[in-house]
């Protein structure tokens, strides 16, 4: 079956602790265990999937490789001629979680060739790239169908035969004390088939390691957390089974000027004391260049101005966000004597008129005065 994202399988976030991962694993393994769901193939498949996700995410090295490269980073078949492994083995679940609560049971039916694993590629973009869209060339390490044997794993003119040990199931029963568990077949290594004359290139695996280059169109407006699915661009399936998909996971880097919130952009623009008091026009940066913004007289620091349509075009609709500019008044520095003198003269003109010129300051000091009066009464 298709390999889903391991974090999604366990229902945990990417920042989940090992304890949270183990807790989720126990709950799901108990829910899907084959002995609780006899004859339920879907539950058995889910059980195997949960176990595989747990094994990867609780191994520090495997988890790091998976976080970077997705399933390609932890595929046990990447060594060349290796056998089937991973999710198909659930015999050792007893020691991990349930002790000797459950017993095993033989499941009928021949093992089907597995669909190729899905791959994930972590793509980091600048804000400009994410907003405008672009085409990216991606180099993807993957498993491709062997071009010598056409994915069969067998030498030209020969073919695979059903394993006589497991009769095509890929697993055998093992008696351990009072319990019976299943393990990968030691003869066919869990494949269910025997290749007597393996292909010289893929050594019987049917797939070979390959790094392919894809040209991927990134739509305008993508944001961190968005995922682009490329159907059929994952790993090749086993022995001619369908390939998996490739998921491009988008992360947008922080910007030096703008902060993005959905389709809106935010920025802070410094203005001088005189410009805030007297009003005028200032230049404001946008992703398309500078625009002029009219500042009314007596503008207070922290006031927000909205420039409609200067934000981000939605990737899912025709809506366009806004640019919100917060003006921040700068206190002048490195003043010469003449400038200081002018400010002193200006300050002197405000004496006795604070309510008129600084209503917020006057209200604040009135509040402080009342606070201490109440405190001492």
UniProtKB/Swiss-Prot annotation:
CDD domains: DnaJ, DnaJ_C, DnaJ_zf. Belongs to the DnaJ family. It comes from Shewanella sp. (strain ANA-3). CXXCXGXG motif repeats lie at residues 146-153, 163-170, 185-192, 199-206. SUPFAM superfamilies: Chaperone J-domain, DnaJ/Hsp40 cysteine-rich domain, HSP40/DnaJ peptide-binding domain. Keywords: Chaperone, Cytoplasm, DNA replication, Metal-binding, Repeat, Stress response, Zinc, Zinc-finger. This is Chaperone protein DnaJ. Signal peptide: none annotated. HAMAP family: DnaJ. The lineage of its organism: Bacteria, Pseudomonadati, Pseudomonadota, Gammaproteobacteria, Alteromonadales.
